[in-house]
A protein has these predicted regions:
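Residue-level marker of positions within ordered structural domains that often coincide
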Residues: 1, 29, 128
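Class I SAM-dependent methyltransferase Rossmann-like catalytic core
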Residues: 1-13
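Acidic/proline-rich low-complexity IDRs
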Residues: 5-8, 21, 58, 155-161, ...
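Intrinsically disordered, low-complexity regions
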Residues: 8, 18, 35-38, 141, ...
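Conserved SAM-binding loop
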Residues: 10-104
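S-adenosyl-L-methionine-dependent methyltransferase catalytic module, highlighting the catalytic core
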Residues: 80-81, 85, 91, 95-191
Length: 191
């Protein structure tokens, strides 16, 4: 898709009811109907075929109202630079939804293309004013919420979930390797 065609697609999606959504690393399925997909694989059917580790992304500034990143951030070479790009392409107040394996999950380590093993606390980094100052005075996020998902053992997962809901920090420091989580689901909002 050319830049002109992408611009026309974004304009059409904006007239369909609000700012468009972007699905980074969309694969074969979009996170929401009508989302513009960006993926490195041509087979994905993404509107934007692009490697997330090439900067800048071929997307306009300040357009998207929602960004979905499901199981992509752990593959990025430079997460900080990637999040700066996410911020650049988003409108102020855009919602950013990120799902990634928790560091205690075996799934975090079984895929050899995973470059990072993340914790729930990772996403607080992007809300720190030092992040905005380090990258750009206009780059920052609010952390709307972060949760861990569990799966596999009803009793033990229930206990892990209960502990994590009471204190993510305590769970990650004391229980993560005993009661491993599956994924982290983070919801950020651009400032």
């Amino acid at each position: 898709m050319t830049q002109a065609e992408l611009g026309e697609l974004i304009a059409r999606r904006m007239t369909d009811g609000g700012p468009p959504a972007l699905d980074i690393g969309c694969g074969l399925k979009r996170a929401e109907p009508g989302a513009i997909g960006m993926d490195w694989s041509e087979e994905s059917g993404a509107e934007v075929v692009w490697d997330v580790d090439r900067y800048p992304w071929p997307l306009p500034d300040g357009v998207f109202g929602r960004v979905h990143m499901s199981h992509i951030i752990e593959h990025m070479d430079d997460i900080v630079r990637g999040m700066k790009e996410v911020h650049r392409v988003c409108r102020t107040g855009a919602d950013v939804f990120i799902t990634t394996p928790h560091f205690s999950s075996h799934n975090s380590y079984t895929d050899p293309s995973h470059r990072h093993h993340l914790s729930a606390a990772t996403f607080k980094y992007f809300t720190d004013r030092r992040f905005a100052t380090f990258l750009s005075p206009r780059c920052g996020f609010d952390l709307v919420g972060v949760e861990l998902t569990f799966g596999g053992n009803f009793v033990l997962d229930g206990l892990g979930r209960l502990i994590a809901r009471r204190s993510l920090k305590w769970y990650e420091r004391r229980c993560a390797w005993i009661l491993p989580a599956s994924d982290i689901r983070a919801h950020l909002r651009t400032l």
